From Swiss-Prot:
UniProt keyword terms in alphabetical order: Signal
Stated name of the protein: BURP domain-containing protein 1
Domain BURP: start-end pairs: 65-270
Organism: Oryza sativa subsp. japonica (Rice)
Gene designation per UniProt: BURP1
Positions of region (Disordered): 225-270
Signal peptide extent: 1-21
Tissue: Expressed in leaves and shoot.
Alphabetical list of InterPro entries matching this protein: BURP, BURP_dom
Length: 270
Protein backbone atom coordinates (compact mmCIF):
# COMPACT_ATOMS: atom_id res chain seq x y z
CA UNK A 1 0.00 0.00 0.00
CA UNK A 2 1.57 3.23 -1.13
CA UNK A 3 1.23 6.31 0.92
CA UNK A 4 3.22 9.47 1.29
CA UNK A 5 5.20 9.61 4.49
CA UNK A 6 7.20 12.57 5.69
CA UNK A 7 9.22 12.55 8.87
CA UNK A 8 10.61 15.27 11.03
CA UNK A 9 13.65 14.40 13.07
CA UNK A 10 13.65 16.66 16.09
CA UNK A 11 17.28 16.71 17.03
CA UNK A 12 17.00 18.69 20.24
CA UNK A 13 20.63 19.37 20.64
CA UNK A 14 22.94 22.11 21.57
CA UNK A 15 25.67 22.69 19.05
CA UNK A 16 26.97 25.34 16.71
CA UNK A 17 27.15 24.64 13.00
CA UNK A 18 30.38 24.27 11.05
CA UNK A 19 31.09 24.05 7.35
CA UNK A 20 33.72 21.94 5.62
CA UNK A 21 34.18 19.56 2.71
CA UNK A 22 31.80 16.61 2.60
CA UNK A 23 33.04 13.64 4.64
CA UNK A 24 32.09 9.97 4.12
CA UNK A 25 29.56 10.34 6.95
CA UNK A 26 27.96 13.35 5.24
CA UNK A 27 27.85 11.47 1.94
CA UNK A 28 26.13 8.56 3.71
CA UNK A 29 23.59 10.92 5.26
CA UNK A 30 22.76 12.44 1.87
CA UNK A 31 22.12 8.98 0.42
CA UNK A 32 20.28 7.53 3.44
CA UNK A 33 18.15 10.60 4.25
CA UNK A 34 18.06 12.50 0.95
CA UNK A 35 15.29 14.93 1.94
CA UNK A 36 17.05 16.35 4.99
CA UNK A 37 20.31 18.29 5.38
CA UNK A 38 22.58 17.00 8.13
CA UNK A 39 22.12 19.14 11.27
CA UNK A 40 25.16 21.03 12.51
CA UNK A 41 24.93 19.11 15.78
CA UNK A 42 25.64 15.85 13.93
CA UNK A 43 28.24 17.43 11.67
CA UNK A 44 30.17 18.66 14.68
CA UNK A 45 30.50 15.08 15.93
CA UNK A 46 32.20 13.92 12.73
CA UNK A 47 34.54 16.90 12.53
CA UNK A 48 38.30 16.58 13.08
CA UNK A 49 37.91 18.44 16.40
CA UNK A 50 35.89 15.54 17.83
CA UNK A 51 37.82 12.82 19.61
CA UNK A 52 37.58 9.46 21.33
CA UNK A 53 38.59 9.09 24.94
CA UNK A 54 36.67 11.32 27.34
CA UNK A 55 33.01 11.48 28.27
CA UNK A 56 31.46 14.93 28.58
CA UNK A 57 30.83 15.98 32.18
CA UNK A 58 27.87 18.09 31.08
CA UNK A 59 24.41 16.69 31.77
CA UNK A 60 23.33 15.37 28.37
CA UNK A 61 19.63 15.83 29.06
CA UNK A 62 19.48 19.17 30.80
CA UNK A 63 16.31 20.87 31.95
CA UNK A 64 14.22 21.01 28.79
CA UNK A 65 10.76 20.06 30.05
CA UNK A 66 7.80 22.36 29.59
CA UNK A 67 4.06 22.09 29.11
CA UNK A 68 2.37 22.92 25.84
CA UNK A 69 0.14 25.46 27.58
CA UNK A 70 3.27 27.39 28.59
CA UNK A 71 4.59 27.69 25.04
CA UNK A 72 3.28 30.90 23.48
CA UNK A 73 4.75 34.22 22.32
CA UNK A 74 5.77 36.25 25.35
CA UNK A 75 5.94 33.31 27.77
CA UNK A 76 9.00 32.99 29.99
CA UNK A 77 10.72 29.83 31.19
CA UNK A 78 14.05 28.82 32.69
CA UNK A 79 15.74 26.05 30.71
CA UNK A 80 19.11 24.35 30.39
CA UNK A 81 20.11 23.45 26.84
CA UNK A 82 23.23 21.30 26.65
CA UNK A 83 25.62 20.39 23.89
CA UNK A 84 25.42 17.07 22.08
CA UNK A 85 28.06 14.80 23.66
CA UNK A 86 30.55 17.66 23.59
CA UNK A 87 33.89 16.75 22.06
CA UNK A 88 33.00 13.08 21.46
CA UNK A 89 33.50 11.59 18.01
CA UNK A 90 30.70 9.90 16.10
CA UNK A 91 32.41 6.74 14.88
CA UNK A 92 31.92 5.01 11.52
CA UNK A 93 29.97 1.77 11.91
CA UNK A 94 33.01 -0.44 11.20
CA UNK A 95 35.03 1.20 13.96
CA UNK A 96 32.10 1.22 16.42
CA UNK A 97 31.36 -2.46 15.84
CA UNK A 98 35.01 -3.37 16.44
CA UNK A 99 34.67 -2.20 20.06
CA UNK A 100 32.49 -4.25 22.46
CA UNK A 101 29.45 -2.49 23.92
CA UNK A 102 28.57 -4.42 27.08
CA UNK A 103 29.11 -3.68 30.77
CA UNK A 104 30.60 -7.12 31.39
CA UNK A 105 33.34 -6.28 28.88
CA UNK A 106 34.07 -2.81 30.21
CA UNK A 107 37.70 -3.63 31.18
CA UNK A 108 38.34 -4.74 27.59
CA UNK A 109 36.65 -1.61 26.22
CA UNK A 110 38.71 0.67 28.46
CA UNK A 111 41.89 -1.09 27.38
CA UNK A 112 41.06 -0.73 23.68
CA UNK A 113 40.34 2.97 24.10
CA UNK A 114 43.28 3.60 26.47
CA UNK A 115 41.03 4.91 29.25
CA UNK A 116 42.05 4.51 32.92
CA UNK A 117 39.82 2.06 34.78
CA UNK A 118 39.56 4.48 37.70
CA UNK A 119 38.38 7.68 36.07
CA UNK A 120 35.24 9.80 35.61
CA UNK A 121 35.08 8.67 31.97
CA UNK A 122 35.07 4.98 32.95
CA UNK A 123 32.30 5.63 35.50
CA UNK A 124 30.21 7.49 32.91
CA UNK A 125 30.69 4.70 30.38
CA UNK A 126 29.57 2.05 32.87
CA UNK A 127 26.42 4.05 33.64
CA UNK A 128 25.57 4.38 29.95
CA UNK A 129 26.14 0.67 29.28
CA UNK A 130 23.97 -0.26 32.27
CA UNK A 131 21.18 2.05 31.09
CA UNK A 132 21.26 0.63 27.56
CA UNK A 133 21.20 -2.94 28.87
CA UNK A 134 18.33 -2.19 31.26
CA UNK A 135 16.33 -0.78 28.36
CA UNK A 136 16.96 -3.91 26.29
CA UNK A 137 15.83 -6.14 29.15
CA UNK A 138 12.67 -4.07 29.60
CA UNK A 139 11.78 -4.84 25.99
CA UNK A 140 9.58 -2.95 23.55
CA UNK A 141 5.93 -1.98 23.81
CA UNK A 142 3.45 -0.85 21.18
CA UNK A 143 4.18 2.73 22.22
CA UNK A 144 7.91 2.62 22.89
CA UNK A 145 11.03 1.22 21.24
CA UNK A 146 14.47 1.92 22.66
CA UNK A 147 17.88 1.56 21.07
CA UNK A 148 21.40 2.78 21.85
CA UNK A 149 23.13 3.81 18.62
CA UNK A 150 26.92 3.78 18.53
CA UNK A 151 27.32 5.00 14.96
CA UNK A 152 25.66 7.32 12.47
CA UNK A 153 24.59 4.37 10.34
CA UNK A 154 22.92 2.49 13.21
CA UNK A 155 21.10 5.65 14.28
CA UNK A 156 19.78 6.35 10.77
CA UNK A 157 18.72 2.73 10.24
CA UNK A 158 16.78 2.65 13.53
CA UNK A 159 15.02 5.86 12.55
CA UNK A 160 14.09 4.62 9.07
CA UNK A 161 12.95 1.25 10.41
CA UNK A 162 10.86 2.77 13.20
CA UNK A 163 9.11 5.25 10.94
CA UNK A 164 8.91 3.11 7.82
CA UNK A 165 10.38 5.88 5.69
CA UNK A 166 13.59 7.69 4.80
CA UNK A 167 11.71 10.89 4.00
CA UNK A 168 13.05 12.72 7.04
CA UNK A 169 13.59 16.40 7.81
CA UNK A 170 16.01 17.17 10.64
CA UNK A 171 15.47 20.08 13.02
CA UNK A 172 17.84 21.05 15.80
CA UNK A 173 18.13 23.59 18.56
CA UNK A 174 21.25 25.72 18.61
CA UNK A 175 23.29 26.95 21.53
CA UNK A 176 25.54 29.91 20.82
CA UNK A 177 27.11 30.16 24.26
CA UNK A 178 30.83 29.31 24.46
CA UNK A 179 30.61 28.53 28.18
CA UNK A 180 31.19 24.97 29.43
CA UNK A 181 28.95 23.73 30.85
CA UNK A 182 26.25 25.72 29.13
CA UNK A 183 24.32 27.96 31.54
CA UNK A 184 20.84 27.38 32.89
CA UNK A 185 19.01 30.61 32.19
CA UNK A 186 15.71 32.36 31.56
CA UNK A 187 14.21 32.70 28.08
CA UNK A 188 11.31 34.60 26.60
CA UNK A 189 9.54 32.93 23.67
CA UNK A 190 9.19 35.32 20.74
CA UNK A 191 7.43 33.04 18.25
CA UNK A 192 6.11 29.47 17.91
CA UNK A 193 5.34 27.52 14.75
CA UNK A 194 3.55 24.12 15.01
CA UNK A 195 4.91 21.17 13.02
CA UNK A 196 2.23 19.01 11.40
CA UNK A 197 2.59 15.38 12.54
CA UNK A 198 -0.50 13.53 11.28
CA UNK A 199 1.07 10.05 11.38
CA UNK A 200 1.59 10.18 15.14
CA UNK A 201 5.03 8.51 15.16
CA UNK A 202 8.33 9.98 16.27
CA UNK A 203 11.82 8.87 17.19
CA UNK A 204 13.44 10.96 19.91
CA UNK A 205 17.18 10.86 20.45
CA UNK A 206 19.50 12.18 23.15
CA UNK A 207 23.23 11.94 23.66
CA UNK A 208 24.64 9.69 26.38
CA UNK A 209 27.98 10.14 28.19
CA UNK A 210 30.58 7.84 26.65
CA UNK A 211 34.12 7.89 25.27
CA UNK A 212 32.66 8.37 21.79
CA UNK A 213 29.24 9.55 20.64
CA UNK A 214 26.40 7.26 21.76
CA UNK A 215 22.74 8.17 21.37
CA UNK A 216 19.68 6.84 23.14
CA UNK A 217 16.88 6.55 20.58
CA UNK A 218 13.23 6.25 21.56
CA UNK A 219 10.60 5.27 19.01
CA UNK A 220 7.37 6.62 20.46
CA UNK A 221 3.76 7.45 19.68
CA UNK A 222 1.34 10.10 20.85
CA UNK A 223 3.06 13.48 20.94
CA UNK A 224 3.06 16.72 19.05
CA UNK A 225 5.87 18.88 17.79
CA UNK A 226 6.59 22.53 17.30
CA UNK A 227 9.34 24.96 16.43
CA UNK A 228 10.36 27.98 18.42
CA UNK A 229 12.05 30.17 15.81
CA UNK A 230 13.42 32.57 18.41
CA UNK A 231 13.83 32.53 22.16
CA UNK A 232 15.42 35.48 23.87
CA UNK A 233 18.41 34.40 25.97
CA UNK A 234 22.17 34.59 25.53
CA UNK A 235 22.81 30.88 25.04
CA UNK A 236 20.13 29.79 22.61
CA UNK A 237 18.72 30.94 19.28
CA UNK A 238 15.97 28.94 17.62
CA UNK A 239 15.07 25.30 18.02
CA UNK A 240 12.54 22.51 18.12
CA UNK A 241 10.20 21.41 20.84
CA UNK A 242 8.12 18.36 21.58
CA UNK A 243 5.11 17.97 23.81
CA UNK A 244 3.86 14.63 25.06
CA UNK A 245 0.34 13.66 26.00
CA UNK A 246 1.75 11.74 28.97
CA UNK A 247 3.52 14.18 31.28
CA UNK A 248 5.97 12.55 33.64
CA UNK A 249 9.17 13.20 35.49
CA UNK A 250 12.45 11.72 34.42
CA UNK A 251 12.73 8.22 35.88
CA UNK A 252 16.09 6.68 36.70
CA UNK A 253 17.78 9.03 34.27
CA UNK A 254 15.42 8.24 31.40
CA UNK A 255 14.03 11.15 29.47
CA UNK A 256 10.27 10.71 28.88
CA UNK A 257 10.60 11.60 25.21
CA UNK A 258 7.49 11.95 23.05
CA UNK A 259 6.81 10.92 19.52
CA UNK A 260 4.46 11.97 16.85
CA UNK A 261 4.70 12.20 13.18
CA UNK A 262 3.91 13.51 9.82
CA UNK A 263 5.68 10.69 10.73
CA UNK A 264 7.57 12.92 13.09
CA UNK A 265 10.92 11.58 13.98
CA UNK A 266 11.94 13.43 17.08
CA UNK A 267 15.49 12.94 18.00
CA UNK A 268 16.79 14.62 21.02
CA UNK A 269 20.51 14.48 20.53
CA UNK A 270 21.26 16.30 23.65
Amino acid sequence: MARSLAAVLLLLVAAAGASHAASPAEMYWKIALPTSPMPGAIRDLISPASSVGSASKEDTVGNVFFLEKDLFPGSKMTLHFTRATAGAALLPRGRAESVPFASERLPEILSQLSIPAVSPTADAMWSTLAECEAARLAGETTKHKHYCATSLESMVEFVASSLGTRDVHAVSTEVISTLTPTPRQAYRVEAVRPVAVPGGDMVACHGMPYAYAVFGLHGLKGAGGGRVPRGRGRARRGGGGIQEARRGARERGHLPLPASGRHDLGAQLN
